[in-house]
Amino acid sequence: TPSRSAEFFFGALVHQTIEDIHRWAMDGKADKLDESEIQNLFHLNFQNLLKRGLRPIGPKQREEAFVQVMNYFKQNRSEFSRIIETEVDVSVEKDNYILIGKVDLLLGGDGKLELLDFKSQPRPAEYDDRIFSYYRQLCTYAHILETRDGRLPERLMVYWTAEPKKEDALMIFPYERNVVDEAGAHFDKVVSQIQN
């Protein structure tokens, strides 16, 4: 549908531009980033999404997406030195399936590991079902990272880029093993239902 297509385009544009900012930071070029350079990255991502045949967003949505990117950049620039990795592929092999995901950002500092996922939408109300769903996803990714690398993330975070202020945008969760176990049981059940 057109609205879902626009929603995907918007989210991908914000997400890919923030990823580019992180890559610049990882390459030691964060100090060269300014609004003009970010506008160039944003424009390139817009063009690349068009080339993929996606239906573009209108000028108002495009401006809103750029504002989200710039708000994130301005309020989180001091964190860029803590970036360990961006767009981290994670997977775990189970008996009957392989669970695959992608972590948007790994941060570190003082020997601690933090996992962050971006959502290009407003922060939902506290008891919205999506929050637990995202939390379960983050716990699963944390478990995969612990299994793969032997390092357990201490903080799991969601960053709602549509929120203008960092304190509203950043949602922090603890890692809880029982949530991982519940998520694993949920995936096992879903796979079993699909196979049968």
Description of each model-found segment:
Residues T1, Q16-I18, N48, D117-P122, ...:
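Short acidic (Asp/Glu) and glycine-rich catalytic loops that position anionic groups and cofactors
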Residues T1-F9:
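C-terminal, charged and often intrinsically disordered regions of DNA end-processing helicases
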Residues F8, I131-R136, R177, D181:
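Short, conserved loop/turn and helix-capping segments at secondary-structure boundaries
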Residues I18-M26, F73, S120-R123, E146-G150, ...:
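Hydrophobic/aromatic-lined pockets within catalytic cores
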